[in-house]
């Protein structure tokens, strides 16, 4: 792993932007994208930049099950608001959380990933070590699948909803095996609440109990962390 330590999340977004810019300039055409609060400053930099993604494909990690793309809490809505409405991509893909045929939805997304090998995969890090919505216990060779969210993940996401009862309890997520197929993985984690997961991811045992620990086995991983997230290294 290439570990980049920064003072704060703003500096982290600047370093992540440089990696996106360099990767695009070198001819990359497929970018795996993430949601949540961590990548928002990065997306703002991409929107304000002269970078041209009009020939690039974006493939998102996950989506809540049961939310339509028009729901303000959906990741379709999030990506439109923060990136896709402002920066043109050739094509964009996000898992279909409304497809009643779950097998079809997961199989379709696996085909999309197979047909568009990811050059750079952006990741955040959950407090319990999840990547995407791959919760502890997820098989390292997993493909796109339906996830029962843990209570800690539900609690962490509750701040985005008016009432905790409105927080979805399931999601459709790219699998860990799919994430690991990317040529380059870029993970960002900021804040003291991520320190335990960061330490276990980087120096702990490789175990499905801590999904992000599998990144130790990938040949090209960049981790951007601030001082608070690095406190327990």
From Swiss-Prot:
Top-level taxon of the source organism: Bacteria
CDD domains linked to this entry: GlcN6P_deaminase (cd01399)
Root EC class: hydrolase
Keyword Hydrolase: yes
Any single GO CC term annotated in Swiss-Prot or TrEMBL for this entry: cytoplasm
Pathway(s) annotated for this protein in UniProt: Amino-sugar metabolism; N-acetylneuraminate degradation; D-fructose 6-phosphate from N-acetylneuraminate: step 5/5
Record keywords, A-Z: Carbohydrate metabolism, Hydrolase
Record field: catalytic activity: alpha-D-glucosamine 6-phosphate + H2O = beta-D-fructose 6-phosphate + NH4(+)
GO biological process assignments: carbohydrate metabolic process; glucosamine catabolic process; N-acetylglucosamine catabolic process; N-acetylneuraminate catabolic process
Molecular-function GO term, any one: glucosamine-6-phosphate deaminase activity
InterPro entries linked: Glc/Gal-6P_isomerase, Glucosamine6P_isomerase, Glucosamine6P_isomerase_CS, NagB/RpiA_transferase-like
Location of the active site: 62 (proton acceptor), 128 (for ring-opening step), 130 (proton acceptor), 135 (for ring-opening step)
E.C. number: 3.5.99.6
Job description of the protein: Catalyzes the reversible isomerization-deamination of glucosamine 6-phosphate (GlcN6P) to form fructose 6-phosphate (Fru6P) and ammonium ion.
HAMAP family: GlcN6P_deamin
PANTHER family: GLUCOSAMINE-6-PHOSPHATE ISOMERASE (PTHR11280:SF5)
Similarity comment: family membership: Belongs to the glucosamine/galactosamine-6-phosphate isomerase family. NagB subfamily.
Protein name: Glucosamine-6-phosphate deaminase
Species for this entry: Leuconostoc citreum (strain KM20)
Name of the gene: nagB
């Amino acid at each position: 792993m290439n570990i980049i330590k920064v003072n704060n999340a703003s500096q982290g977004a600047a370093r992540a932007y440089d990696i996106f810019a360099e990767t695009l300039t070198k001819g990359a055409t497929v970018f795996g994208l993430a949601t949540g609060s961590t990548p928002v400053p990065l997306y703002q930099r991409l929107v304000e930049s002269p970078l041209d993604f009009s020939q690039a494909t974006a493939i998102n990690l996950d989506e809540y099950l049961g939310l339509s793309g028009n729901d303000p809490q959906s990741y379709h809505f999030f990506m439109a608001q923060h990136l896709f409405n402002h920066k043109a991509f050739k094509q964009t893909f996000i898992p279909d959380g409304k497809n009643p045929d779950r097998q079809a939805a997961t199989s379709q997304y696996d085909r999309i990933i197979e047909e568009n090998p990811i050059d750079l995969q952006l990741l955040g890090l959950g407090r319990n070590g999840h990547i995407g919505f791959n919760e502890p216990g997820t098989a390292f060779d997993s493909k796109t699948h339906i996830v029962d969210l843990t209570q800690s993940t539900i609690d962490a996401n509750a701040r985005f909803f008016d009432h905790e009862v409105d927080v979805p309890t399931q999601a459709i997520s790219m699998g860990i095996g799919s994430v690991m197929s990317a040529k380059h993985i870029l993970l960002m984690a900021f804040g003291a609440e991520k320190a335990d997961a960061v330490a276990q991811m980087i120096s702990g045992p490789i175990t499905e109990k801590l999904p992000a620990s599998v990144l130790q086995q990938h040949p090209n991983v960049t981790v951007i962390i601030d001082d608070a997230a690095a406190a327990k290294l």
